[in-house]
Regions:
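Substrate-binding pocket helix/loop in short-chain dehydrogenase/reductase
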Residues: 94-96, 103-105
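Active-site helix of classical SDR
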Residues: 119, 155
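Residue(s) in the substrate-gating loop at a strand-loop-helix junction
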Residues: 139
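C-terminal helical subdomain
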Residues: 175, 179-182, 187, 196-245
Length: 249
């Protein structure tokens, strides 16, 4: 897909996959609306990208905050064509029996409600304009339990179903909803997982994690017609065939 002149909204854009995606999409000619809770990192990133970028401080757990940010992106660039639901957290990592209920709920607010809020805010305008792409970062944790990750596993399983629901309800409206399970990525989240010392994922060597630009480049590829066959589904970047199609290997 030629994304030149298109507008992409990226949540969790301050670091990791989100920040890499901002650079990849901007390099491809897209306008990028950078969403994050703290302003410093996205202000710096927007300045580096230039006129194609706008920074929008936003709490994805609040629908009003997300709706306002999406509206500002549309006001600035004229449209919202692509939404990348990337914002997500995993801390505090804790066993169910000792998890703090409020902290557990906060992860659900960000990882699940944050995705719903983004989808809900963009769908009416995308439908009115004839379509758009809603890409959501998923996880292998959506498919099986991981020790001390009950909040993360539950939120990612629910997010997978949200993608399927959007496809079922709005696929005929031109909405391309696709999930991306990137595998383990060399980001701050893996630093936090490593520090926990809990479960086999925390024991992985750093060099087995893929670089953050891989999922970023996959997200760009997912905006093109080659990915149409995957609408309503979840792609796994562990798949070597997919890596080849994206041009990663």
């Amino acid at each position: 897909m030629n994304v030149a002149g298109k507008t992409v909204v990226i949540t969790g854009a301050s670091r990791g996959i989100g920040a890499e995606a901002a650079g990849v999409f901007a390099a491809a000619g897209a306008n990028v609306a950078l969403i994050a809770r703290s302003s410093d990192a996205i202000e710096k990133l927007a300045a580096e990208i230039g006129e194609q970028a706008i920074e929008l401080t936003c709490d994805v757990a609040s629908y009003a905050s997300v709706e306002g940010a999406i509206a500002k992106a549309k006001e600035t660039f004229g449209s919202v064509d692509i939404l990348i639901n990337n914002a997500g957290v995993i801390e505090p990592i804790a066993h169910l029996a000792s998890a703090d209920p409020d902290e557990w709920g906060t992860v659900i607010d960000i990882n699940l409600k944050g995705v719903f809020n983004g989808m809900r805010a963009v769908l009416p305008m995308m439908i009115a304009s004839g379509g758009g792409s809603i890409l959501t970062i998923s996880s292998g944790a959506a498919h099986g339990p991981v020790e001390a990750w009950s909040h993360y596993c539950a939120s990612k399983a629910a997010v997978k179903m949200l993608t399927e629901c959007v496809h079922k309800e709005n696929g005929a409206d031109g909405i391309r909803a696709i999930g991306l399970s990137p595998g383990t990525v060399a980001t701050q989240m893996q630093v936090e997982i490593k520090a926990s010392g809990i479960n086999p994922v925390s024991q992985l060597d750093w060099d087995v994690h893929i670089p953050a630009d891989w999922p970023a480049r996959a997200l760009l590829w997912m905006c093109g017609s080659d990915a149409d066959q995957y609408c309503g589904q979840e792609l796994s970047l562990r798949d070597e065939d997919l890596r080849k199609r994206v041009g990663l290997i």
